[in-house]
Amino acid sequence: MSGIRHHILSVSVFIVLAALDFMPMHFHGWMILPLLWLSMCALSRKQYVLATALFFSFLGDVMGWKRELIPQIGFFALAQVTYIILFSLLKPPSATWPKPIRMGFLLLLAGIYGTATCWIFPRVTDSIVMGGMAVYALLLLAMCYAAFCHKNLCLTVGAVLFVVSDFIIGVNLFVCHIPHSFLCIMVPYYLGQLLLYVGAQRLY
């Protein structure tokens, strides 16, 4: 199968699987399938590091579906580490962002972490969960910065959407209930993962 056809097929099936998760069905396990599909697509193209990051995300989704928060955090932390490794291996950009832009983005990420530290983490009663969330948040934001440094729109937007989704999860779980939280969490999550996949395809 040609690269373009493979790309169209992988994205199309992902969109269908993700859309099924929002349908009013009795089986709500569709959420574990989209990332497994993307992982298999990357594996079929011998993109092993990308496939590993997506597979760890799939395992995180499985743990989330089973409401196992600590294993969920652990698998997504492994996914972020693998994404960071992936970005270090992908084709580097022809030019880097100017230093003021890089510093501004770092300040934005630091502000997000500071907000989580002051607003979300103190409301977590389990010290193990709080510690895991603190470490995971650092890895997530490091992944976001690594994606940003590639000057690739898909990678940057995908990583930012990943951050948005996880921030909403934290607020919804520990601060206050967010109306339509499932949509608010899963739409940016699915879009973010898809854009990370698409962006990585362009740099392999």
What are these regions, as identified by a protein language model?
Residues 1-204:
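Polytopic alpha-helical membrane-helix bundles and their juxtamembrane interface segments
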